């Protein structure tokens, strides 16, 4: 068989022309330091800020400090298997978390991995943990109410869908209870809730999850947890992971309530990371960008325009104070970012007034426009009445004689305080709140002994459920008060047949 040189030449040329280079070019570096959730690597000259980096053992990190000689990396997850001299490579991606309906009812870590032992989560979508907040023209003003089921909040400091309302107070003043009750009250309200537990004890998170499950709230709730035993990078990233999951629903036109419990611990974790990365410390040793840490998170909560689906994210961030000091650094930062704050006071809590909301220091800057008409009418003067009662109460401790008008104000004030108390995990529908506040502001409780107020309230609801459910239905459907004569007659009929004279 003769060898044809021309055929061989043509074959080689054809193969050269069809050659597809199949190289996997990645930039790699060498780990020079590892410890406390932080790594430093040399050789990643083109790494981008916030880029996801992969270590040779499969662990991931995020580039935070881009310095002339090396890159400071925060490690997402366990860092015990990483050693100096290990290879770390760029991925060209930023950190993303799984999002979607499959997460609802599950407990996940900030990376979106399940930690509830109920198997894998089949999600198809991913969202970056850091995304720009909606711009001014992409937003709508807050106009729809978010009912928490707590009389003291819905009447005095109303919250609207798309609002950011800070819950601030010392430890053990009932901050988490307020948020859990708000989540329980969203049952049947077409809301998705996300509870982000940052730096909590695992036993505490387990208790909250069981509470949500017991009341059927886990059916519409995602729990994201970065417990106190986990490395600081996970505590730092947890709120951003939570809001990324929320944004997926918001841009589908759905409404989301997200609770950050609490941002004080996230700030402490970020301070720890910043100091380990050798960033210059500022006030209280926090880095200079700690304000931006929280502002870029909370600005992602919004009521978006109809062009973007008209969805919303309502945020309830928590801040823990020391001895009621709301003028501390992180507290004042978050107060200035949010649309109002609910201040919980330890002395009110200890004296049995729960939820322990200080009406004088609490404010809702945009929620008033979202309040339903009925609530506006019955609760309009409630805050001022409560403030003047507190002032008079302090004054009367000096034992001076009181005129009839002052005595009447004190009597009404005592009953107001009693009405605003509420048992744990028993949120009230708005129509019931309106009826009892109407009874209070129109003097129907003035002759009821203070000790009987809560019993009166329960009996009134039961009586209305049986005999005057049409009045509840009117408030539910029209969002306005029924005819005052009808309400007056109904409450009077209840009082006439009851023992509360």
Swiss-Prot record:
<dbReference type="InterPro" id="IPR027417">
    <property type="entry name" value="P-loop_NTPase"/>
</dbReference>
<keyword id="KW-0472">Membrane</keyword>
<dbReference type="GO" id="GO:0043531">
    <property type="term" value="F:ADP binding"/>
</dbReference>
<keyword id="KW-0547">Nucleotide-binding</keyword>
<keyword id="KW-0813">Transport</keyword>
<keyword id="KW-0067">ATP-binding</keyword>
<dbReference type="Pfam" id="PF02874">
    <property type="entry name" value="ATP-synt_ab_N"/>
</dbReference>
<dbReference type="GO" id="GO:0046933">
    <property type="term" value="F:proton-transporting ATP synthase activity, rotational mechanism"/>
</dbReference>
<keyword id="KW-0066">ATP synthesis</keyword>
<keyword id="KW-1278">Translocase</keyword>
<comment type="similarity">
    <text>Belongs to the ATPase alpha/beta chains family.</text>
</comment>
<comment type="subunit">
    <text>F-type ATPases have 2 components, CF(1) - the catalytic core - and CF(0) - the membrane proton channel. CF(1) has five subunits: alpha(3), beta(3), gamma(1), delta(1), epsilon(1). CF(0) has three main subunits: a(1), b(2) and c(9-12). The alpha and beta chains form an alternating ring which encloses part of the gamma chain. CF(1) is attached to CF(0) by a central stalk formed by the gamma and epsilon chains, while a peripheral stalk is formed by the delta and b chains.</text>
</comment>
<protein>
    <recommendedName>
        <fullName>ATP synthase subunit alpha</fullName>
        <ecNumber>7.1.2.2</ecNumber>
    </recommendedName>
</protein>
<dbReference type="InterPro" id="IPR005294">
    <property type="entry name" value="ATP_synth_F1_asu"/>
</dbReference>
<dbReference type="InterPro" id="IPR036121">
    <property type="entry name" value="ATPase_F1/V1/A1_a/bsu_N_sf"/>
</dbReference>
<dbReference type="InterPro" id="IPR004100">
    <property type="entry name" value="ATPase_F1/V1/A1_a/bsu_N"/>
</dbReference>
<feature type="site" description="Required for activity">
    <location>
        <position position="362"/>
    </location>
</feature>
<dbReference type="InterPro" id="IPR000793">
    <property type="entry name" value="ATP_synth_asu_C"/>
</dbReference>
<dbReference type="Pfam" id="PF00006">
    <property type="entry name" value="ATP-synt_ab"/>
</dbReference>
<dbReference type="GO" id="GO:0005886">
    <property type="term" value="C:plasma membrane"/>
</dbReference>
<keyword id="KW-0406">Ion transport</keyword>
<dbReference type="GO" id="GO:0045259">
    <property type="term" value="C:proton-transporting ATP synthase complex"/>
</dbReference>
<keyword id="KW-1003">Cell membrane</keyword>
<dbReference type="InterPro" id="IPR000194">
    <property type="entry name" value="ATPase_F1/V1/A1_a/bsu_nucl-bd"/>
</dbReference>
<dbReference type="InterPro" id="IPR033732">
    <property type="entry name" value="ATP_synth_F1_a_nt-bd_dom"/>
</dbReference>
<dbReference type="InterPro" id="IPR038376">
    <property type="entry name" value="ATP_synth_asu_C_sf"/>
</dbReference>
<comment type="function">
    <text>Produces ATP from ADP in the presence of a proton gradient across the membrane. The alpha chain is a regulatory subunit.</text>
</comment>
<dbReference type="Pfam" id="PF00306">
    <property type="entry name" value="ATP-synt_ab_C"/>
</dbReference>
<feature type="binding site">
    <location>
        <begin position="169"/>
        <end position="176"/>
    </location>
    <ligand>
        <name>ATP</name>
    </ligand>
</feature>
<dbReference type="GO" id="GO:0005524">
    <property type="term" value="F:ATP binding"/>
</dbReference>
<dbReference type="InterPro" id="IPR023366">
    <property type="entry name" value="ATP_synth_asu-like_sf"/>
</dbReference>
<keyword id="KW-0139">CF(1)</keyword>
<keyword id="KW-0375">Hydrogen ion transport</keyword>
């Amino acid at each position: 068989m003769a060898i044809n040189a021309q055929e061989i030449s043509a074959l080689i040329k054809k193969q050269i022309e069809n050659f597809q280079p199949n190289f996997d070019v990645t930039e790699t570096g060498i780990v020079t330091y590892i410890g406390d959730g932080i790594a430093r690597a040399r050789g990643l000259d083109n790494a981008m800020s916030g880029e996801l980096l992969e270590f040779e053992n499969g662990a991931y990190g995020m580039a935070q400090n881009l310095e002339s000689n090396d890159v400071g990396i925060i490690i997402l997850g366990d860092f015990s298997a990483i050693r100096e001299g290990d290879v770390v490579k760029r991925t060209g991606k930023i950190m993303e978390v799984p999002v979607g309906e499959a997460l609802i009812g599950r407990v996940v870590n900030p990376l979106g991995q399940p930690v509830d032992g109920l198997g894998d989560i089949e999600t198809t979508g991913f969202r970056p943990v850091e995304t720009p907040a909606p711009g001014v023209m992409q937003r709508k003003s807050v106009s729809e109410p978010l009912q928490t089921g707590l009389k003291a909040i819905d009447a005095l400091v109303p919250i609207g869908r798309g609002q950011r309302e800070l819950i601030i107070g010392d430890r053990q003043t009932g901050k988490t209870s307020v948020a859990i009750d708000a989540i329980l009250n969203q049952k049947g309200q077409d809301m998705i809730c996300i509870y982000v537990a940052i730096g909590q004890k695992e036993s505490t998170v387990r208790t909250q999850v069981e509470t949500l499950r017991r009341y059927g709230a886990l059916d519409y709730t995602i729990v994201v947890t970065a417990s106190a035993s986990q490395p600081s990078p996970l505590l730092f990233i947890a709120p951003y992971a939570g809001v990324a999951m929320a944004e997926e629903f918001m841009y589908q036109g759905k409404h989301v309530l997200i609770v950050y419990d609490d941002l004080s611990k996230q700030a402490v974790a970020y301070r720890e990371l910043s100091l380990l990365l050798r960033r210059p410390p500022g006030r209280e040793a926090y880095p200079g960008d700690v304000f931006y840490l929280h502002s870029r998170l909370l600005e992602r909560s919004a009521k978006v325009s109809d062009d973007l689906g008209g969805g919303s994210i309502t945020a309830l961030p928590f801040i823990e104070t020391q001895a009621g000091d709301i003028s501390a650094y992180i507290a004042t930062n978050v107060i200035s970012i949010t649309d109002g704050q609910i201040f919980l006071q330890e002395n009110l809590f200890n004296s049995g007034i729960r939820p322990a909301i200080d009406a004088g220091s609490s404010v809702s800057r945009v929620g008033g426009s979202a309040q339903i008409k009925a609530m506006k009418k019955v609760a309009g003067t409630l805050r001022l009445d409560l403030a003047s009662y507190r002032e008079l109460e302090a004054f009367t401790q000096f034992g001076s004689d009181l005129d009839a008008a002052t005595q009447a104000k004190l009597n009404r004030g005592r009953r107001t305080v009693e009405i605003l108390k509420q048992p744990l995990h028993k949120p009230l529908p708005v129509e019931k709140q309106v009826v009892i506040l109407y009874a209070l502001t129109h003097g129907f409780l003035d002759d009821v002994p203070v000790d009987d107020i809560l019993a009166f309230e329960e009996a009134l609801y039961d009586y209305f459920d049986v005999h005057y459910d049409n009045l509840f239905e009117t408030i539910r459907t029209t969002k306005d008060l029924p005819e005052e004569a009808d309400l007056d007659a109904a409450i009077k009929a209840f009082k006439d047949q009851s023992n509360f004279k």
